[in-house]
């Protein structure tokens, strides 16, 4: 009998709370009055959220700050010594976001969070350096069970031949 107490209290709270009451921090909408939203921007990390208003204000503030010539010179020196280049690639991702939806049955309205999927189609760029590519190659070799390149050149570790060439040839007449 004591189990009915919380259910009855929740049911009464749903009738007592007016339909225009919205929990703090939740914007609601109905399906018939949805307007086209502005395209959203995303970061590399799907756990982070960009607020377009703050992004624009940050960009406006950063545009006022000009880097010093010493900073520009050190950046160009780093790029030339490390042999780095800017690589562009497509970074299409599928994001799952929760959007609030307000639903009303007669005069009883409630807000629920529905999961929606957003496809992000962007061209991303990253700074690639020759030394990082060499380290990636070395890690791939280690994960494949191959020796490091310097040990392979010194004949420290020999791999078995991949295939016997004589076995591949068909025996002719």
UniProtKB/Swiss-Prot annotation:
Its main location: secreted. The keyword ATP-binding does not apply. GO terms for cellular component: collagen-containing extracellular matrix; extracellular region; microfibril. InterPro entries: MAGP. Keywords: Aortic aneurysm, Disease variant, Disulfide bond, Extracellular matrix, Glycoprotein, Secreted, Signal. Residues 1-21 form the signal peptide. May play a role in hematopoiesis. In the cardiovascular system, could regulate growth factors or participate in cell signaling in maintaining large vessel integrity. Component of the elastin-associated microfibrils. Interacts with TGFB2. Interacts with BMP2. Interacts with FBN1 (via N-terminal domain) and FBN2. This is Microfibrillar-associated protein 5. It comes from Homo sapiens.
């Amino acid at each position: 009998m004591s189990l009915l107490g919380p259910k009855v209290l929740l049911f009464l709270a749903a009738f007592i709370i007016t339909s225009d009451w919205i929990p703090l921090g939740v914007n609601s909408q109905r399906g018939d009055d949805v307007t086209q939203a502005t395209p959203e921007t995303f970061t590399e990390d799907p756990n982070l959220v960009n607020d377009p208003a703050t992004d624009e204000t940050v960009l406006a503030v950063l545009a006022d700050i000009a880097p010093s010539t010493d900073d520009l010179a050190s950046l160009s020196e780093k790029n030339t010594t490390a042999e780095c280049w800017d690589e562009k690639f497509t970074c299409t991702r599928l994001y799952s976001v929760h959007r609030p939806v307000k639903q009303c049955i007669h005069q009883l309205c409630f807000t629920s969070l529905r999961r929606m999927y957003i496809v992000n189609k962007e061209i991303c760029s990253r700074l690639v350096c020759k030394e990082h590519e060499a380290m990636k190659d070395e890690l791939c070799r280690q994960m494949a069970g191959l020796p490091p390149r310097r040990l392979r050149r010194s004949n420290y570790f020999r791999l078995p031949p991949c295939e016997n060439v004589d076995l591949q040839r068909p025996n002719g007449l």
